[in-house]
A protein has these predicted regions:
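Short, glycine-anchored, charge-dense loop/turn motifs used at functional sites
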Residues: 161-171, 350, 367-378
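Short solvent-exposed beta->alpha transition segments
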Residues: 28-38, 50-100
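Second-shell loop/turn segments in exported
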Residues: 38-41, 55-60, 107-110, 148-152, ...
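N-terminal Sec-pathway targeting helices
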Residues: 2-13, 26
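Short, low-complexity N-terminal intrinsically disordered segments enriched in polar/charged residues
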Residues: 18-42, 46
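Beta-lactam-recognizing serine transpeptidase/beta-lactamase-like catalytic domain environment
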Residues: 317-327, 342, 365, 370-424, ...
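Small/polar-residue-rich segments within soluble enzyme cores
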Residues: 102-125, 129-143, 149-155, 167-201, ...
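Conserved, well-ordered alpha-helix/loop/beta-strand core segments that scaffold catalytic motifs
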Residues: 323-365
Length: 711
């Protein structure tokens, strides 16, 4: 009797569930299958998991509780970052009592985009009512009750950076990672202490990391990361003798390795992993954790090109963790490579010379070598520099923070961001203005030589008659200059005579001096891939002071006054002497390309050469001034930079910053004896301390280029 009563109660309970489900589902005899399926799809799209549970068959409900069902959906859709669900295109595919409906399930995922699956649901008729035979496959097709969903980001490989010859400058690699295998480490504290003594680490912090990792079920703790070649073999051998220590070179720590360390650091730039703060910016909002983004230099300017597009793989894993099936896979797309115009050999030579010479008196500055006929930058160095490999690993090295505090500003690209008075290199601009306006000829002599007076043992001075100037125009006294005869333009250029060019600037007049300076681009921001500071003729955009004050006009004509210019722009202007009077637009990226497994580049785009200022003066003027400048390294201010077997068009300059500091310049163009490149050396250093540096660096580079041409 009791057994019969239990059966009756069980049947009644089942019937009650069915009746409730029917009432909630609204499934009637007429087209009940379709109506029930439709209600299921609507509940799914609304994420109404209570409604789904209420329309499930008793057998489905016996396999999972209401709370577990909600948890199941939430866990899976949370893993997939689902923000929207759409069930559409449903169609009954049989006429059996258990009706099967095929449908398209579309999940909108924040990380994966739109995921589409072909799915199906079974509607069963029970006692004339219609209920859903629910399975985990209705969450994601193919799932079983104990399966888990794993979403794995497929990292889009960042493009690499090469020099003009194809030498790799920045590549994707793996660090030398020193780590502890905790399963093989008997005494955490003792091993941490031993390794810390070898690699100069914090033993206490390391031991704490090991203890914390072990408590969390992890068996690996990274102790130190090194760029390949940085860990000494002797230290590695000693480290491996410590209990539990292992060394990995191929899988643990991916890095962005700068093959030549600090070489071309400001031009190449660096990248670091995207931060939470970055992702608040729309530009980086969709990037996955760990994706590198460029911060400065070419890494920043060409970030969108270098950065690959991440893919995604969604995998079903069984209860034992084994991979059961791939639900979805979108392949990653590698970034494209960037080929720079620089020659790494020349770049290394420039930086070696700067390190040797500039460090002697803590000078700073820049060196640029370019091709006057194309605008290609063949070398660009800023001193002091920094090691790009400080940013190679996912976490920046300790020394990276010190760069920001360093008073020498090693992160500053002085070639493009340093604004300096051009000094006497500007006399080559004034000479163009004088000749092109017809104010003087090369042989036009200064008419007031008898008014020049001796000021000191090393300087002479001149003040126009009737002038109210409180100071004279001062020049350095060079006894050897007298051998050139009268004080004309040739003598004035060779020996950098301030008196001649101050006088000539006044004769040309403010209007034409300004016009010719502007014609050469001064007062503009010269176009370049990297950001460049805008040059100026004076602090006043209208340059009114040049009209009102002859002394200021004369000072400007010799390269002082309030003139400011970047080394990049001054090098471009001087390059007109190697290009028949045209200034080419400088550029540092040769091409964007893809690279195959054999290292062969296929260009996607190539930078086209273009003039920045076409034919700013006649070729006749260029030849006249060049003939004068050829004597600068023979008899004049740059004799120390002369290289036997080379014909050089050159000009030096010095500009006083204050009573204790000056800017030293040397610009030169190789006319014969080497590749027809133009170079510029800028030295920001102590007073009377830049002359030997600028000429020795220039001579070293000229010699290198001569040897390269002959090899």
């Amino acid at each position: 009797m009791k057994k019969r009563l239990v059966n009756i109660l069980a049947a009644a309970a089942a019937l009650a569930v069915i009746i409730i489900a029917v009432l909630l589902c609204g499934c009637a005899q007429k087209d009940g299958y379709e109506k029930c399926a439709e209600d299921f799809f609507n509940a799914l799209q609304a994420k109404d998991y209570d409604a789904i549970y209420d329309m499930m068959t008793p057998s489905s409900q016996s396999s999972i509780s209401r709370e577990k069902l909600k948890e199941y959906y939430d866990k899976v859709y949370s893993a997939l970052e689902v923000t929207g669900i759409e069930a559409s295109e449903f169609e009954r595919v049989n006429q059996d009592r258990d009706a099967v409906f095929n449908y398209s399930l579309k999940l909108t995922s924040q990380s994966c985009g739109e995921l589409s699956f072909d799915s199906s649901v079974t509607v069963r008729a029970l006692l004339g009512f219609y209920l859903v035979e629910w399975t985990p496959g209705n969450v994601v097709p193919g799932m079983d009750y104990y399966d888990t969903v794993q979403v794995r980001t497929l990292r889009g490989i960042r493009g690499e950076i090469f020099d003009s010859s194809g030498a790799v400058l920045v590549k994707n690699a793996y660090a030398v990672t020193v780590y502890f295998n905790l399963n093989k480490t008997a005494d955490f504290a003792a091993s941490a202490q031993a390794l810390a003594g070898i690699l100069e680490l914090d033993a206490d912090a390391l031991a704490q990391s090991m203890t914390k990792a072990a408590a969390g079920g992890n068996d690996t703790v990274v102790a130190a990361v090194y760029v390949p070649g940085a860990l000494e073999a002797e230290k590695e051998e000693r480290a491996l003798a410590v209990d539990g220590v292992r060394v990995d070179r191929s899988s643990i720590t991916p890095i962005r390795q700068a093959v030549y360390g600090s070489a071309a650091a400001h031009l190449i730039g660096y990248s670091t992993p995207v931060t939470k703060e970055d992702r608040s910016n729309e530009k980086y909002a969709g990037l996955s954790e760990g994706t590198r983004v460029g911060r400065i230099g070419a890494e920043y300017i060409y970030d969108d090109i270098l950065r690959g597009t991440d893919g995604v793989e969604i995998v079903l894993r069984s209860a034992d963790g084994s991979r059961r099936t791939v639900l979805y896979r979108k392949e990653a797309t590698a970034g494209q490579d960037v080929v720079l115009t620089i020659d790494i050999g020349l770049q290394l030579e420039a930086e070696s010379l700067m390190q040797e010479k500039y460090s002697q008196n803590k000078s700073t500055g820049a060196v640029i070598v370019n091709d006057p006929k194309s605008g290609r930058i063949k070398a660009m160095a800023s001193y002091p520099t920094f090691d790009l490999n400080l940013y190679a690993a996912p976490a920046a090295a300790k020394g990276a923070a010190d760069l920001i505090k360093n008073e020498a500003l090693p992160l500053l690209n002085r070639a493009t961001q340093g604004l300096y008075p051009p000094g006497s290199v500007y006399k080559t601009v004034s000479a163009i203005a004088g000749l092109e306006t017809g104010t003087v000829r090369v042989d036009t002599a200064f008419p007031y030589e008898d008014e020049i007076v001796k000021v000191t043992d090393k300087t002479d001075g001149w003040r126009p008659k009737g002038s109210q100037w409180s100071h004279m125009i001062i020049r350095e006294h060079m006894k050897s200059s007298a051998s050139y005869g009268k004080l004309d333009m040739k003598r004035a250029l060779v020996f950098s005579d301030n008196i001649y060019f101050g006088w000539m600037g006044m004769k040309v007049g403010a209007k034409d001096m300004i016009a010719w300076s502007e014609r050469l681009g001064i007062g503009e921001q010269i176009p370049f891939e990297l950001s460049v500071k805008k040059s100026q003729i004076s602090n006043d955009p209208e340059n009114a002071k040049l009209y009102k004050n002859d002394k200021f006009l004369a000072d400007t004509a010799v390269g002082h006054g309030e003139l400011l210019i970047t080394p990049l722009q001054l090098s471009a202007i001087f390059s007109l002497y190697g290009n028949s009077g045209s200034i080419m637009q400088p550029y540092c990226v040769e091409s964007i390309c893809t690279t195959d497994e054999l290292g062969r580049h296929t260009a996607v785009s190539v930078t086209k050469e273009q003039a920045y200022k076409e034919q700013v003066c006649s070729n006749a003027t260029v030849e006249k001034i060049s003939a004068c400048l050829e004597k600068v390294t023979v008899d004049g201010t740059a004799k120390a930079a002369n290289v036997k077997g080379m014909t050089l068009v050159a000009k030096t300059g010095t500009a006083q910053k204050n009573d204790t500091e000056e800017i030293g310049w040397m610009a030169g163009y190789i006319r014969e004896g080497g590749e027809h490149y133009s170079l510029l050396v800028c030295v920001d250093g102590p007073k009377n301390g830049t002359g030997a540096i600028k000429t020795s660096v220039a001579k070293g580079l000229f010699t290198y280029l001569k040897d390269e041409a002959q090899s």
